[in-house]
């Protein structure tokens, strides 16, 4: 149980020059510490790459930490635990000669200090070990009342899900109910094709859209469960995913499997009660792709393509739910446009984890395309717009459709021009923005169908 933690708030690196590093701890806290220190205490600890130990190891209290690295690789990771109440922060660096030291493996991963929290980690190339201050119930009894405040929190996210009972929270997080972007990206291709199948001069069938909306939510949730069950070992090693319920052992595989079974039953019940047989068969045929996707990142650099096959299946099913079958001249280019769209947004999304993906050994288009991502995704963006144009031609859409689709392309241009592939926050922002692209194109289809000449629509149906 970690009793005290080190706050890494201010730091700087200087030019490399030797094989050792000096860690300067500056205490700006004038309160009394466990060792009865008063005022400002300064402790310098020097460790050497060759002997891998610390000297001058003493108890200190620190609100500010400065690292001066004089090695070729920064010694400290930029991740830290922060004291819950921002009060005294104590740690001990014990003599490495002690046999009971708790060792912390060194790690050279470098992330953003101000945005992340994690245990203190040192560069693994230096094989240096440090010990942390453990809770000792036999000493410092004055701090017993505060010990719970100094423990790393087991609540991963303080959001609206946290208001639910503890037994329910893991299932909600497993379903990603707090991250609806996946539902929107799954639903929009369904709504596109439902709208394209609507009669000329008419709004799309809202009841069918509602059915597909519920189905998109349930199936996306089921897909997340399948993905997390397959990837729990990888997820536990990736900073962004290590708090997922299965990876963090909040849920067992048995509990997750039961939950998945309930979701699939609900989905099949909805499909059987609401859709025609052609569409039922079409929806059922997508299930192998859904199950296959989580495993593809082990074998190919193109799991995003498989995700595109699954996520855009609604471009086929939505049309057949209205028309009774697929008009392939319309839905085929729409489906291909959707796959290309997925390649764009999910490659951007994958750039968030590319460093961790290399460490754990999984593949993605982010790693495959690397520094050429912007150019390659520009090609896929062109395929998105081309597929939408071909769909409009096959569906005999009015001029407004083509003007609107051309305007939609500006969103794809914007996100590829402004995304910083080396900044996870930028990647996430651009990924989420794709829900706007999906909505824009849906509105364009709806307005275009209202403007469509009914005589031209009859000619299409005869084909």
UniProtKB/Swiss-Prot annotation:
InterPro entries: HB_polyprenyltransferase-like (IPR006370), Prenyltransferase (IPR039653), UbiA_prenyltransferase (IPR000537), UbiA_prenylTrfase_CS (IPR030470), UbiA_sf (IPR044878). It holds the Pfam family UbiA. Pathway: Cofactor biosynthesis; ubiquinone biosynthesis. Its EC number is 2.5.1.39. Residues 137-150 have a biased composition (Low complexity). It is an enzyme of class 2 (transferase). The chain crosses the membrane at residues 181-201, 206-226, 257-277, 305-325, 330-350, 375-395, 431-451. It catalyses: an all-trans-polyprenyl diphosphate + 4-hydroxybenzoate = a 4-hydroxy-3-(all-trans-polyprenyl)benzoate + diphosphate. GO terms for biological process: isoprenoid biosynthetic process; ubiquinone biosynthetic process. It is a multi-pass membrane protein. Its cofactor is Mg(2+). NCBIfam families: ubiA_proteo. Catalyzes the prenylation of para-hydroxybenzoate (PHB) with an all-trans polyprenyl group. Mediates the second step in the final reaction sequence of coenzyme Q (CoQ) biosynthesis, which is the condensation of the polyisoprenoid side chain with PHB. This is 4-hydroxybenzoate polyprenyltransferase, mitochondrial. It comes from Dictyostelium discoideum. The gene is coq2.
């Amino acid at each position: 149980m970690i009793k005290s933690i080190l706050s890494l708030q201010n730091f700087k690196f200087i030019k490399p020059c030797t094989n050792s590093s000096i860690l300067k701890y500056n205490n700006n806290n004038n309160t009394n510490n466990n060792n009865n220190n008063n005022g400002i205490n300064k402790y310098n600890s020097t460790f050497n790459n060759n002997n891998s130990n610390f000297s001058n190891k003493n108890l200190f209290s620190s609100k500010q930490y400065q690292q001066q690295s004089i090695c070729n690789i920064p010694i400290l990771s930029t991740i830290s635990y922060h004291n819950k109440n921002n009060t005294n922060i104590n740690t001990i660096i014990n003599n490495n000669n002690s046999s009971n030291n708790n060792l912390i493996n060194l790690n050279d991963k470098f992330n953003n200090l101000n945005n992340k929290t994690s245990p203190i980690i040192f560069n693994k190339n230096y094989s240096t070990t440090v010990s942390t201050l453990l809770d000792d119930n036999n000493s410092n009894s004055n701090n017993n009342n505060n010990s719970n405040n100094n423990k790393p929190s087991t609540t991963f996210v303080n959001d609206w899900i946290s208001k639910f009972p503890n037994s329910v929270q893991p299932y909600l997080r497993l379903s990603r109910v707090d991250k609806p972007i996946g539902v929107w990206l799954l639903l929009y291709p369904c709504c596109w094709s439902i709208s394209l199948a609507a009669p000329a001069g008419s709004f799309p069938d809202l009841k069918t859209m509602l059915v597909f909306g519920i189905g998109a939510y349930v199936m996306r949730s089921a897909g997340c469960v399948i993905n997390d069950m397959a990837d729990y070992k990888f997820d536990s090693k990736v900073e962004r995913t290590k708090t997922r319920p299965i990876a963090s052992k909040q849920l067992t595989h048995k509990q997750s499997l039961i939950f998945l079974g309930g979701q699939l039953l609900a989905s099949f019940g909805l499909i059987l009660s609401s859709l025609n047989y052609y569409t039922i068969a079409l929806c059922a045929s997508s299930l192998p792709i859904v199950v296959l996707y989580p495993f593809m990142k082990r074998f190919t650099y193109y799991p995003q393509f498989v995700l595109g096959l699954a996520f855009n299946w609604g471009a086929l099913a939505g049309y057949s739910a209205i028309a009774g079958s697929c008009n392939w001249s319309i839905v085929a280019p729409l489906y291909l446009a959707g796959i290309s769209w997925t390649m764009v947004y999910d490659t951007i999304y994958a750039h968030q984890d590319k460093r961790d993906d290399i460490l754990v050994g999984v593949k993605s288009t982010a790693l495959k395309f690397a520094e050429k991502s912007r150019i390659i995704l520009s090609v896929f963006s062109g395929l998105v717009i081309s597929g939408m144009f071909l769909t409009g031609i096959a569906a005999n859409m009015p001029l407004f459709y083509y003007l609107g689709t051309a305007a939609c392309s500006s969103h794809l241009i914007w996100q590829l021009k402004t995304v910083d592939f080396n900044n996870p926050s930028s990647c996430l922002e651009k990924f989420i923005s794709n829900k706007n692209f999906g909505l824009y194109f849906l509105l364009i289809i709806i307005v275009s169908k209202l403007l469509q000449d009914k005589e031209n629509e009859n000619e299409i149906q005869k084909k």
